[in-house]
């Protein structure tokens, strides 16, 4: 394994790392932040903030759809009898 990493140029490893970091931000970090933001501010958002959030949801949809089965965004108090 050591010789394999030495055979790959340093610039190539940096490019692979940069792609990995951008992919992680696009698919994990920003979508989780959007879920958190929408959950905290859903009932108090203004028109422009909601429009901006809708645009970000459209932009980061692939990452959001990855977490959709695991997150529950129902408002508190829903389902009480």
Curated annotation (Swiss-Prot):
It is a multi-pass membrane protein. Keywords: Membrane, NAD, NADP, Plastoquinone, Quinone, Thylakoid, Translocase, Transmembrane, Transmembrane helix, Transport. Its EC number is 7.1.1.-. It catalyses: a plastoquinone + NADH + (n+1) H(+)(in) = a plastoquinol + NAD(+) + n H(+)(out); a plastoquinone + NADPH + (n+1) H(+)(in) = a plastoquinol + NADP(+) + n H(+)(out). Its main location: membrane. The chain crosses the membrane at residues 13-33, 51-71. InterPro entries: NADH-quinone_OxRdatse_su_L (IPR019654). One of its GO terms (cellular component) is plasma membrane-derived thylakoid membrane. PANTHER family: NAD(P)H-QUINONE OXIDOREDUCTASE SUBUNIT L, CHLOROPLASTIC. This is NAD(P)H-quinone oxidoreductase subunit L. It comes from Synechococcus sp. (strain WH7803). The lineage of its organism: Bacteria, Bacillati, Cyanobacteriota, Cyanophyceae, Synechococcales.
């Amino acid at each position: 394994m050591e010789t394999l990493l030495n055979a790959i140029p340093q610039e190539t490893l940096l490019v692979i790392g940069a792609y990995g970091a951008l992919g992680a931000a696009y698919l994990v970090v920003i979508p989780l932040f959007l879920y958190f933001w929408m959950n905290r501010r859903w009932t108090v958002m203004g028109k422009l903030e909601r429009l901006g959030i809708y645009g970000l949801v459209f932009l980061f949809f692939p990452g959001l759809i990855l977490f959709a089965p695991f997150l529950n965004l129902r408002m508190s108090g829903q389902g009480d009898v």
